[in-house]
From Swiss-Prot:
NCBIfam families: plsX. Keywords: Cytoplasm, Lipid biosynthesis, Lipid metabolism, Phospholipid biosynthesis, Phospholipid metabolism, Transferase. Pathway: Lipid metabolism; phospholipid metabolism. It is found in: Cytoplasm. This is Phosphate acyltransferase. Belongs to the PlsX family. Signal peptide: none annotated. Homodimer. Probably interacts with PlsY. Pfam families: FA_synthesis.
């Protein structure tokens, strides 16, 4: 049995989508227990494997992260993180304030001893539909080569245990594929990656080929990773908007759109981030999953599933054995 702590109040459409996702999760997985933290006046579920705990406070999206974690001691997010810290829960999921969740992860759950800096990891879609693991996407704006090496090790374990890839290929994001390309950070990181035997390093990868499906794990610093992530999100939204405007621009195009409807739906599903769940803060002494703030019930359900798999695979202990001291 895996037990997951869930923040009922975090996210743009909480608690509605959270309750829908939790209900579906406990119905689908008979070996899953949920501890749900939030406002009891908005709780409407009844299930033997859902334990509800009332919280008097909520961390808002506009709250300053560290101050919110320190001052709102009875918030759903803080209580959720404390359940992981105490060992009562195997992991936690929230769609709330990203900075606050990262602070809760660092200051309440705590780092694995030996991990210099945790990394925020996401799984992004690829043209072949399999997706790739990408980190760091914003946990740390600055990084040393040694940090990138740890990110590679953490990402390798994540790809193996969460995504089920036996021998993941790991690449370093750079401005060229040649070993000599890049700045001092990527050059030093390349040397460290090449000497390390704990993962399958396949060299540099350029941003233009990220979504081709050629690699399983891509490593970069948090500053670069966050910009790449937001660029991909923005590009996807723009393409979708332009495609819709083109289809609706004439009767002929509307007919073509009707003919291609199923194919367009298949394409949209292949590129849907919600299929992969949320982002995970790797390197902590517990599983912390961040669902997108605008998550629907499907995306939040995927994030719960993600945390459940992490618990089943004992991913935190494996990271301790591999990267920890």
């Amino acid at each position: 049995m895996v037990k997951i702590a869930v923040d009922m109040m975090g996210g743009d459409d909480a608690p509605g989508i959270v309750l829908d996702a939790v209900k579906k999760a406990v119905e689908d997985f008979k070996d899953l227990e949920i501890i749900l933290f939030g406002d009891e006046s908005q709780y409407n579920l009844s299930h033997e494997r859902i334990e509800f705990r009332h919280c008097t406070e909520k961390i808002e999206m506009e709250d300053e992260p560290v101050r919110a974690i320190k001052r709102k001691k009875d918030s759903s997010m803080v209580k959720m993180a404390e359940a992981v810290k105490s060992g009562e829960a195997d992991g936690c999921v929230s769609a709330g304030n990203t900075g606050a969740l990262m602070s809760a992860g660092l200051f309440i759950v705590g780092r694995i001893k030996g991990v210099a800096r945790p990394a925020l990891v996401v799984t992004l879609p690829t043209t072949d539909g399999k997706g790739f693991v990408f980190l760091d996407v914003g946990a740390n704006a600055d990084a040393k080569a040694e940090h990138l090496l740890q990110y590679a090790q953490l990402g390798n374990i994540y790809a193996q245990k969460i995504r089920g890839i036996q021998n993941p290929s790991v690449s370093l994001l750079n401005i060229g594929t040649e070993a000599a390309k890049g700045n001092s950070l990527t050059k030093k990181a390349y040397d460290l990656f090449e000497k390390n035997q704990s993962f399958n390093f396949t060299g540099n990868i350029e941003a233009k080929t990220l979504m081709d499906g050629n690699v399983d794990v891509v490593v970069t610093d948090g500053y670069t990773g966050n910009m790449v992530l937001k660029n991909l999100e923005g590009t996807a939204k723009s393409i979708g908007k332009m495609l819709k405007e083109t289809i609706m621009s004439s009767f002929k195009n509307k007919l073509a759109g009707a003919v291609l409807k199923k194919d367009l739906e298949t394409f949209a599903k292949k590129m849907d981030y919600s299929e992969y769940g949320g982002s995970v803060l790797l390197g902590l002494d517990g599983t912390v999953v961040k669902a997108h703030g605008s998550s629907n019930a499907k995306a939040f359900y995927s994030a719960i599933k993600q945390a459940k798999i992490a618990g089943e695979e004992n991913i935190v202990q494996i990271m301790k054995d591999t990267v920890g001291e």
